[in-house]
Amino acid sequence: MYYSEEIGLPKTDISRWRLRSDALGRETWHYLSQSECESEPQSTFVQWLLESPDFPSPPSSDIHTPDEAARKGADFLKLLQLDNGIFPCQYKGPMFMTIGYVTANYYSKTEIPEPYRVEMIRYIVNTAHPVDGGWGLHSVDKSTCFGTTMNYVCLRLLGMEKDHPVLVKARKTLHRLGGAIKNPHWGKAWLSILNLYEWEGVNPAPPELWRLPYWLPIHPAKWWVHTRAIYLPLGYTSANRVQCELDPLLKEIRNEIYVPSQLPYESIKFGNQRNNVCGVDLYYPHTKILDFANSILSKWEAVRPKWLLNWVNKKVYDLIVKEYQNTEYLCIAPVSFAFNMVVTCHYEGSESENFKKLQNRMNDVLFHGPQGMTVMGTNGVQVWDAAFMVQYFFMTGLVDDPKYHDMIRKSYLFLVRSQFTENCVDGSFRDRRKGAWPFSTKEQGYTVSDCTAEAMKAIIMVRNHASFADIRDEIKDENLFDAVEVLLQIQNVGEWEYGSFSTYEGIKAPLLLEKLNPAEVFNNIMVEYPYVECTDSSVLGLTYFAKYYPDYKPELIQKTISSAIQYILDSQDNIDGSWYGCWGICYTYASMFALEALHTVGLDYESSSAVKKGCDFLISKQLPDGGWSESMKGCETHSYVNGENSLVVQSAWALIGLILGNYPDEEPIKRGIQFLMKRQLPTGEWKYEDIEGVFNHSCAIEYPSYRFLFPIKALGLYKNKYGDKVLV
């Protein structure tokens, strides 16, 4: 029973929810009338996710061998695939996303439909800290000022009364943390838009930077794509002092989120609070150069001429509209989407065509689940999960069973439809994307290096298998050549991190720019960074491509692979042999990818000291029950931190690395496989255990499909290498 049920909060009827998804993977939730329900049955995925008694659970059976376990897992996963080939999931974890959705609606006076409102309240309540009732940066974090303030305000704006026990408890925690004045930069900005804080107390985000010459290293177009996408509209709202009209509810909230000794609101000297951030929140403190710049810019804001601001506004809004054109009004992610929606409402009005198109996209990032409804980290994980499923069914031999062909065909065709076939509009500061794949959907519009490589590899696998000859030409060789060109473009071959691959683009500015990081709660956000995982996946894709297309730029591709491998080797920890992961937790995740990349170029435990050290590192972390467990704390501290209990996903990661690294002793690998099999339910399902992903070193995020994909891969690889033995 969830906490929301214990305290008697309203909930919707789970039988009336439907998830609709189109050919390009768009996901939207709908609450139907009883008559509509009869003509549109729930998918088995929705029945499973919402814990419906109507879910057709597979029959229970004893599982004795790795192949039986892999097949049982694949059979269960089949029930979670939609007809368009995707594996939808609630990509959740961050607790600062929903405030944008709620703020954009409140600012534009857009009413949130009742079923969504009810379930958003449930989710926030069900993710409150069980002891102090606050919220953190993410769902498994300690309570922070940022998380507690944002979610407190959300609950109030969604209709919860201030005297509700949930809010009384949360308010006590918020006051203990110093009240709303101690929010980090983004928190202060959202509060200012809501007229719950004053812009004079927010450090500047100068939109004038977009009018600077591009050749300057500080030009925002050279920043990391997420950071520039957020600070583009944030700069507009800050410079134009965009705020809601003050109403009775906002007046009430003003008197709730500050410590009583700080009130009345009108007496707070907001200009003195710009750098006042709660110590619990402060992951990346200001540098002296940033404080100096903020001091100068805050004085500039007071004297900036109106004509200059109008000139800058025009440039900023032009770039925002280009973002709409490049992403079909989705924007790169929910934070920038919400800021952009506020800007469009302010600049054009709520009756404008652009605003109405944004309203049509608002629910793309909402996802329902048993805890309630929340705003996800992006509009999904569609391409990423589909590419892995296809690959792993090939690598494990499941492809040889015709009963899995339909699954593979659906995901293959989805990947084909998801490739970018045109570039971005001119003047939007975007690199070539034609030929690339995104993380989620084609409409989202952003190239990602590892997604491109993994999708390309999956497609090549299907195109070269006799069972799928009839759909081979759904994508042409030239499309794959385009994908390779994008990967070659993204690799860092200049003066910064030679041989590495970043996420969306190559590194365009010196890493020293991080000293101007204003966010306070994240690290490594100012510019693109090199990532071992992205480099690993790019190697996997390019080596597989070279195998089937040996005549396409062989020398350049081999040079690219060789320099990437050297970067992977150079990134290994000299002491313990691990690799640090930035997108999964943490050393286990990155070590798996690194060992697989090294495996593809023929390096193993016997031939490579790096592989030997990497495998020995993983072995040293195995727990007595045969599993592995790494805490998200290691992402923050940059040192391996054991988790409390062995975890299925991390155990699968370690096993994959050991098997592909050709670790010579089968015994610890066998114990790990036995652990995976014992954790599997008789129906084939693995239950959720703990958060799997991370970003920017400090924020955890869930990848729900991982608990199926990686155990299936580990089990199949074991069977391929050691035979299908009775282990349980």
UniProtKB/Swiss-Prot annotation:
It is found in: Lipid droplet; Endoplasmic reticulum membrane. Disulfide bonds: none annotated. It is a peripheral membrane protein. PFTB repeats lie at residues 117-159, 561-602, 611-657. GO terms for cellular component: endoplasmic reticulum membrane; lipid droplet. Lanosterol synthase; part of the third module of ergosterol biosynthesis pathway that includes the late steps of the pathway. ERG7 catalyzes the cyclization of (S)-2,3 oxidosqualene to lanosterol, a reaction that forms the sterol core. The third module or late pathway involves the ergosterol synthesis itself through consecutive reactions that mainly occur in the endoplasmic reticulum (ER) membrane. Firstly, the squalene synthase ERG9 catalyzes the condensation of 2 farnesyl pyrophosphate moieties to form squalene, which is the precursor of all steroids. This is Lanosterol synthase. The gene is ERG7.
